[in-house]
């Protein structure tokens, strides 16, 4: 009897020892090997497939809580110029991924992402190669009409982002910066007809604002929501046009808010409604003139009831209201009005 009891105790000790050993091995694999494997494979993929460089700071994974953390990542050109970076990425996965046969993430949080978006003189974009592999996979999936993989994300948040944009196709490079950028996505699912709620907000260095929120479905692909652009400066528009117009947009702001409804299946349908488009304190000068005095000042323009339907290729505007407009004109030696030069320049352009 004693020998049997001792044998049972020995087996228990052996089982506990094996279990403890497996836990230690599991912990070592999760804490040490997986972060190393992720770092090596990520850098190899970026180097060999994308022809870029990837630097990663601290990479850690907790195999007991399924929490992945990556800090101080930087994607760069071969020349060393930065394409994108972020301060911190945290992904909290769930064990439910196993029995739900889906990628289930409780939370994804990206802090301080920084993207340098450059349009080269030939029209190419510096991030084109980043989506090359994904495009091949997407094309193959489209040919076979394979369903999307099941993905569920409880919350995805992007905090304090920044995008620096440079367009080198212009006569002089046009630059603009959006910061800070915030984005939130809640209860995301790729399930059929599931509505995913999102909210996006950004501000330019000039104080111009963009807010975009609504819902979208992954299957079929579609979206509806509302958007708002506030205090878009006339100077920003003029800086981008760079002399394509005979007039210069010297002052003023443009603001509007609207709603949209987009469907991509079975055909593209897009309806946009703009209840009011507001132009405030617009001032226009002649670009070629030696003085900088405005040739036209319009304190207030309101365009109301604008409806755009892509499906029927129709645009409707209910009302255009102009208040307090002042135009400065003089008669030239040939008897024509000075403002007629603007229409002549436009025709030549």
Stretch-by-stretch model annotation:
Residues 1-51, 115-116, 122, 224, ...:
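N-terminal type II signal-anchor transmembrane helix
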Residues 2-6, 52, 72-185, 218, ...:
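Secondary-structure transition motifs
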Residues 207-210, 220-222:
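Outer-membrane beta-barrel translocator/receptor signature
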Residues 212, 225-227:
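Membrane-embedded beta-strands that build the outer-membrane beta-barrel scaffold
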